[in-house]
């Protein structure tokens, strides 16, 4: 195989590989001879089929295989010799593919962008600040009160009392669209908490002020994106009878409440709440610390970036943000989404940090264990209740999906590795100050 360089600009590489016709013919003959002892053909004993007949019968297929193997081997040898690591799969094209015939040399072009050499990052001088929040008694009490509210019961209000937001009303209702009842549009003794927004918009608001015994005609319009297409956008009337109006009664904050939530006592429940709150604060603090570290690394090291990686990342960012702004659109049945300059700037940062962290992780021999991958798959599978097995099979058969799960685990382990060697000071802050620091992350 002859190799000629055609491009070497920045990270872009181009080569022309030529496989002489004689070499290809020799490889085809060698493959046919290797297969000859096992070939059976009518009119011949096993292993006695003439080479000429074998070539006529199998030559084209064998030639295609030999051609592909030769090109693949030449590319592997070239990459090993040059030390290049392609950023993406090299683009391989046959120059004379349309006119090529047996006896001609095989000429292919190979083009790719090489990953850049990553300069050494001096991590010894990295200084970071970890925000520390301790759960206060007020925060624990507030969490307890929320638990008590969630465990609340309802008691009948005095006869004639008007219902207000937060009250529970017990109703019978019958819905009509175009004068006809529809499936799922009626119920009896239905408990509805006003203000819970569990019914379609406008329904609950019209029952505020109703009293037990009142009959109310509730007029609403189903949302355009309503889950039942036959009702979407339709006007509806619900004939509603209010049978009871009940006031919320928060549960007592005592040992009985604690037992409802699996704790042995109120003190034990308080301890669990404190641990949960501080775990949440630590998680949020880590986000701030990680962003600070990534900002430092981004400023610390500069190197050329493969345009193909930046372009792919920018398109992915643009696509993701577009879908976040258009949640009603599913799939990819939309026009081309062009990345903006902001998308490209963010893509450059992500690619640069991704390559740098990969280099640091490789030198530190950081890997993602099978156990860590299994835990990640389990966490993701919980988002698809009833379809866990199908999700597992999808991950097993999809290397790209595996990499999408592995990448953030690897990144976090590399970040932890850097933080362990950095000078980290702790700064006590309030919950509000931590929340402001988190909000600032979203604005960057």
Swiss-Prot record:
Annotated keywords: Cell cycle, Cell division, Chaperone, Cytoplasm, Isomerase, Rotamase
Protein name: Trigger factor
Gene3D superfamilies: 3.10.50.40, Trigger factor ribosome-binding domain, Trigger factor, C-terminal domain
The keyword Cell membrane belongs to this UniProt entry's keyword annotation: no
E.C. numbers: 5.2.1.8
Lineage: Bacteria, Pseudomonadati, Pseudomonadota, Alphaproteobacteria, Rhodobacterales
Gene Ontology cellular component terms for the protein in this record: cytoplasm
Catalytic activity: [protein]-peptidylproline (omega=180) = [protein]-peptidylproline (omega=0)
Molecular functions per Gene Ontology: peptidyl-prolyl cis-trans isomerase activity
HAMAP family in UniProt: Trigger_factor_Tig (MF_00303)
Major localization class: cytoplasm
PROSITE patterns named among the record's database cross-references: FKBP_PPIASE
Record domain PPIase FKBP-type: where: 166-251
Superkingdom of this protein's organism: Bacteria
Family: Belongs to the FKBP-type PPIase family. Tig subfamily.
């Amino acid at each position: 195989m002859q190799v000629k360089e055609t491009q070497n600009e920045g990270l872009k590489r181009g080569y022309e590989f030529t496989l002489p016709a004689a070499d290809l013919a020799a490889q085809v003959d060698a493959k046919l001879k290797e297969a000859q002892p096992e070939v059976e053909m009518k009119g011949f004993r096993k292993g006695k089929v003439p080479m000429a007949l074998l070539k006529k019968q199998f030559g084209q297929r064998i030639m295609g295989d030999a051609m592909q193997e030769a090109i693949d081997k030449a590319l592997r040898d070239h990459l090993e010799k040059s030390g290049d690591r392609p950023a993406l799969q090299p683009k391989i094209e046959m120059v004379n593919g349309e006119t090529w015939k047996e006896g001609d040399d095989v000429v292919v072009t190979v083009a790719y962008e090489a990953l850049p050499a990553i300069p050494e990052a001096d991590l010894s001088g990295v200084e970071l600040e970890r925000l520390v929040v301790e759960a206060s008694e007020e925060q624990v009490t507030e969490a307890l009160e929320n638990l008590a509210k969630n465990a609340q019961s309802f008691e009948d209000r005095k006869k004639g009392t008007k219902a207000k937001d937060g009250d529970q009303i017990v109703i019978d209702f019958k819905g009509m669209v175009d004068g006809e009842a529809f499936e799922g549009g009626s119920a009896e003794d239905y408990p509805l908490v006003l203000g819970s927004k569990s019914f379609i918009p406008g329904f609950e608001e019209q029952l505020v002020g109703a009293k037990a015994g009142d009959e109310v005609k509730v007029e609403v319009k189903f949302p355009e994106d309503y889950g039942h297409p036959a009702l979407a956008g339709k006007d509806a009337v619900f004939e509603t009878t209010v049978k009871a109006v009940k006031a919320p009664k928060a549960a007592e904050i005592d040992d009985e409440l604690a037992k409802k939530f699996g704790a042995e006592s109120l003190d034990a429940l308080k301890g669990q709440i404190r641990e949960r709150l501080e775990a949440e604060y630590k998680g949020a603090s880590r986000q701030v610390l990680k962003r600070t570290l990534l900002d430092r690394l981004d400023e610390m090291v500069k190197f050329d970036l493969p345009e193909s990686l930046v372009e792919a990342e920018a398109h992915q960012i643009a696509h993701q943000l577009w879908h976040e702004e258009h949640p009603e659109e599913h799939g990819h049945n939309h026009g081309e989404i062009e990345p903006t300059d902001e998308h490209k700037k963010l893509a450059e940062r992500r690619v640069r940090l991704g390559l740098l962290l990969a280099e640091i992780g490789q030198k530190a021999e950081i890997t993602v264990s099978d156990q860590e991958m299994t835990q990640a798959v389990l966490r993701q599978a919980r988002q698809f209740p009833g379809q866990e097995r199908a999700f597992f099979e999808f991950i097993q058969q999809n290397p790209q999906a595996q990499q999408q799960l592995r990448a953030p685990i690897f990144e976090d382990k590399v970040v932890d590795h850097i933080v362990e060697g950095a000078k980290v000071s702790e700064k006590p802050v309030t919950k509000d100050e931590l929340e402001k620091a988190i909000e600032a992350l979203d604005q960057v």
